[in-house]
A protein has these predicted regions:
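Glycine-rich flexible loops
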Residues: 2-150
Length: 150
């Protein structure tokens, strides 16, 4: 007979959580690494490259944030080509030009100290839907936040 048959549910849960903690440890990543991974995830999700949007993450120093270089697609971003910029989009670390459209990210970070990352994209299918000028039919639970707002 199994040893676990005599254990309580709370002990089994505790053991399972302990095993998961040991086996599924999430590696620590730098902000540029997280930003690059997020860009890749967005690209894999159909968010195209080029001028299809911007992503930024708050820097450690007040008034700074990390962003991708202008001209590189989400699929081309690596932790080594991410830029650290100030509120005037002056590059403090890295080489390249940030997207001038990132300027509004500075305003958001200044007004909302609780915000640590901004993702602004133009997915192809959403752009196509917006050109139809037809209100969305809220017919799925995932769209409920849009009820009477689209």
């Amino acid at each position: 007979m199994s040893d676990t048959m005599s254990l309580s549910k709370s002990v089994l849960i505790e053991q399972a959580q302990s095993q998961m903690q040991a086996l599924f440890e999430i590696p620590e990543r730098s902000v540029p690494e997280k930003l690059a991974l997020t860009c890749r995830i967005l690209f894999d999700g159909g968010h195209d490259s080029g001028l299809a949007g911007q992503i930024t993450a708050r820097g450690e120093q007040e008034g700074t944030y990390f962003t991708q270089q202008l001209g590189l697609g989400f699929d081309e971003i690596t932790s080594t080509n991410v830029l650290l910029v100030d509120e005037d989009l002056t590059v403090l670390k890295g080489y390249g030009m940030p997207n001038p459209a990132n300027r509004f990210h500075s305003w958001v970070y200044r007004a909302r100290p609780d915000v640590n990352c901004i993702i602004h994209t133009h997915p192809l299918h959403v752009a196509a839907l917006s050109m139809l000028e037809v209100p969305l039919n809220v017919s799925h639970m995932d769209n409920c936040p849009l009820y009477e707002d689209c």
